[in-house]
C-alpha cells in the first residue's frame, strides 16, 4: 500500500507542476510588435520590453517614448521600458497593477491570467476591468 501511495505521488507531481503556470518569462504581443519579459520583484510582478519589431525610427535613431504625457520622459527609449507594474498574484490571476502603452502614452489598470502558453492581459479604464480590452500574449520558448 505504501508503494502504491508513493507511486501515485510521483505520477501526480508533474501534473501539479503543469497546473502551477508561472507568468515569469518572455511573452510576445499578439501583433508580434514586441516581446515583454515579466519578472518578479519582491511580491509584485513587472514587465519590460526586451525586443521590438521596429527598434529604430526612420532616421535610424532608437524608438523613443514620444507620446508620454510627461515631456521629460519623451526621450527615453522604448526598448527596456517597463510597461507592466505592480501586479500581485492571487486567486489564479495577477491584478492590481498597471500597463503602460507607449503607442499612445496612456496607462491603464491591468490584470493578467496564464492559460497554458497564452497570457491573457487585460487593460482597463476602471479597477474592476469592466471597461477595457483583453489581449493574448504568447509565451516565447527559449
How would you label these PLM feature ranges?
Residues 122:
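Ligand-binding face of N-terminal immunoglobulin V-set domains in extracellular IgSF glycoproteins
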Amino acid at each position: 500500500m505504501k508503494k502504491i501511495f508513493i507511486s501515485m505521488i510521483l505520477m501526480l507531481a508533474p501534473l501539479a507542476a503543469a497546473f502551477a503556470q508561472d507568468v515569469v518569462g518572455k511573452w510576445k504581443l499578439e501583433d508580434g510588435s514586441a516581446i515583454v519579459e515579466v519578472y518578479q520583484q519582491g511580491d509584485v510582478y513587472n514587465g519590460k520590453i526586451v525586443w521590438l519589431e521596429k527598434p529604430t525610427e526612420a532616421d535610424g535613431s532608437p524608438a523613443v517614448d514620444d507620446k508620454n504625457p510627461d515631456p521629460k520622459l519623451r526621450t527615453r527609449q522604448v526598448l527596456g521600458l517597463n510597461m507592466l507594474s505592480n501586479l500581485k498574484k492571487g486567486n489564479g490571476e495577477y491584478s492590481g497593477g498597471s500597463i503602460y502603452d507607449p503607442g499612445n502614452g496612456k496607462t491603464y489598470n491591468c490584470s493578467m491570467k496564464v492559460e497554458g502558453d497564452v497570457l491573457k492581459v487585460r487593460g482597463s479604464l476602471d479597477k474592476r476591468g469592466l471597461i477595457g480590452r483583453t489581449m493574448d500574449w504568447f509565451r516565447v520558448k527559449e
